[in-house]
Amino acid sequence: MVQGKFKVLDSDIHIIEPPDLWPRYIDPAFRDRAPIGLTEDEGDLRLAYNGKGWGRVAIDADRSRRRQGRNYALNQERWRPYAERGWTSKVQLEAMDIEGIDVAVVYPSRGLFALTIPDMDPPLAAAMARAYNDWLHDFCQENPERSEERRVGKECRSRWSPYH
């Protein structure tokens, strides 16, 4: 993958977290309050929390943009195979290979909204950040031989408990 003498770095690669990330990874004491990812569109980034939706759908999946052209349908088809495979770490590594990317800094997508839910109490926010970080660690272990040098996960931090 190395292009000449240089490695190709994607400094801002995003993953789409599984809808059940927080129920699966959060401390059991918070499991009944954990948000769940919504999946109405191929790139749905929203969360359900306390019976309400939070976040937004991916830009290309934004329903208000459907009338503005064909991009919505094209992108739904483009991303469908990845969504059907669960946006897994293996899928991410394949995409990096297709694009010729050697190293990537991995950022959240759905996780960007997780800690912005209004009125979330600090202990829950800290538990959600830990759950995301635990999941991200597992995500980056798909191929341990490549993970150390190929992907760096950008951890999630709760603003109320940034070091936990």
Model-derived features: where do they sit?
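Helix-coil boundary/capping segments in enzymes
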Residues: M1-R157
